[in-house]
Swiss-Prot record:
Species classification: Bacteria, Pseudomonadati, Pseudomonadota, Gammaproteobacteria, Enterobacterales
Keyword DNA repair: yes
InterPro entries, A to Z: ARFGAP/RecO, DNA_rep/recomb_RecO_N, NA-bd_OB-fold, RecO, RecO_C
Organism expressing this protein natively: Salmonella gallinarum (strain 287/91 / NCTC 13346)
Function: Involved in DNA repair and RecF pathway recombination.
Keyword Mitochondrion set for record: no
Coiled coil ranges: none
Keywords: DNA damage, DNA recombination, DNA repair
Family to which the UniProt record says this protein belongs: Belongs to the RecO family.
Protein name: DNA repair protein RecO
PANTHER family cross-referenced by the UniProt entry: DNA REPAIR PROTEIN RECO (PTHR33991:SF1)
Length: 242
């Protein structure tokens, strides 16, 4: 694609002595694999720009699976993610790299991604609400439509006080058994409205998105989750010392 378009680097790795292999998420072309020739050389002005969470304008060309980066400019400084928000950002980057096919346009998802990392950069509390909203948006763009407002068995509106069991590709059915696959009507309302007023609804939304994303991720664990688990004990110890 010869024209300029907005983009973010999801992941990069060394490619030859002076180049980088980039996995980027673009507004118009979706996920694209690019070679940035000479980007690792000492004289390259791209080195600082081709970092995750830096808003970019870029141009590339090529007809094969791997394109060639022609130009790239940082629109602004990288969004300030650190600590838990940095690990959260790495998680959504890895999520996109795992579930999106190359060169499939997801323009609306691009702005959902931008909104998510902006929310992470601006949060002073838990990153969980921003992550859950992004996961739900991603599922919607992947065609994973779920009706949170009506019981799939009876067609009636869900009741806040009742319990519902989730069945993949079918929806929620009233249930008298409570286990890890069931949700209250109150949980479903929170999922529908993308609002999580307490820890209980946040935990329920996390259970649901993990269940729903599992078919797309397969059995291979996410590296960012493991990094997050390693980070959390250190963070807990530091908070206790403080």
């Amino acid at each position: 694609m010869e024209g300029w378009q907005r983009a973010f680097v999801l992941h990069s790795r060394p490619w030859s002595e002076t180049s980088l292999m980039l996995d980027v998420f673009t507004e118009e072309s979706g996920r694209v694999r690019l070679v940035a020739k000479g980007a690792r050389s000492k004289r390259s002005n791209l080195k600082g720009a081709l970092q995750p969470f830096t808003p970019l304008l870029l141009r590339y060309s090529g007809r094969g699976e791997v394109k060639t980066l022609r130009s790239a400019e940082a629109v602004s400084l990288a969004l300030p993610l650190s600590g838990i928000t940095l690990y959260s950002g790495l998680y959504i980057n890895e999520l996109l790299s795992r579930v999106l096919e190359y060169e499939t346009r997801f323009s609306e998802l691009f702005f959902d991604y931008l909104n998510c990392i902006q929310a992470l950069a601006g949060t002073t509390g838990s990153p969980e609400p921003a992550l859950r909203r992004f996961e739900l948006a991603l599922l919607g763009h992947l065609g994973y439509g779920v009706n949170f407002t009506h019981c799939a068995g009876s067609g009636e509106r869900v009741d806040d006080t009742m319990t519902y069991r989730y069945r993949e590709e079918k929806g929620f059915f009233a249930s008298v058994v409570i286990d890890n696959n069931t949700f209250t009507g109150r949980h479903l309302k929170a999922l529908e409205e993308r609002e999580f007023p307490d820890v209980d609804t946040l935990r329920a939304s996390k259970r649901f998105t993990r269940m729903a994303l599992k078919p797309y991720l397969g059995g291979k664990p996410l590296k960012s989750r493991e990094l997050f688990r390693q980070f959390m004990p250190k963070r807990t110890v530091k908070m206790k010392k403080d």
